[in-house]
Regions:
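Extracellular beta-rich repeat passengers
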Residues: 1-22, 26-145
Length: 145
């Protein structure tokens, strides 16, 4: 589900994305709030924020298959991925979303080599994550800044 510049007047509640060929949820700017999100067996990232997204996301779960990951040479698979923009500039508004009450699960077994981090927060992002649990191993890092 890709959201570009969606404002806070929009309500997103009880949405499931399954078997996505890219990110389950990606926000490019905007300030929309979302609740009760499920990401199931997606290829790329579960929750990806960019370009000044400043909304709040609460009550989300990601269920990952350890053998299903993005095989593109230009990408890898993360629970969270967040950038201010592609170059890491100080452009405003800054990506400053807040996530709370999130659970990420990777099933037991050998994890595909394209998995990277549970939390990949980079390029001048100011993402905040509260009360969140990860169950399973991301091979590169749990938290990558």
């Amino acid at each position: 589900m890709t959201l570009g510049g969606v404002g806070y007047g929009t309500k997103i509640d009880y949405v499931q994305v399954s078997h996505s060929g890219d990110d389950a949820y990606e926000w490019f700017g905007g300030a929309v709030n979302a609740k009760h999100l499920i990401s199931y067996r997606t290829l790329d990232d579960d929750f990806d924020t960019d370009n000044g997204f400043s909304g709040n996301v609460q009550y989300a779960v990601a269920l990952r298959d350890p053998l299903v990951a993005d095989q593109c040479s230009c990408s890898d698979s993360n629970g969270f991925e967040s950038d201010n923009d592609g170059s890491g500039s100080t452009a405003l508004p800054q990506t400053s979303a807040k996530f709370a009450n999130v659970s990420i699960y990777i099933a037991n077994g050998t994890v595909d080599k394209k998995y990277r981090s549970a939390f990949r927060i980079r390029r001048n992002s100011a993402l905040s994550i509260y009360n969140t649990v990860v169950n399973g191993a991301f091979p590169k890092a749990g938290l990558e800044l």
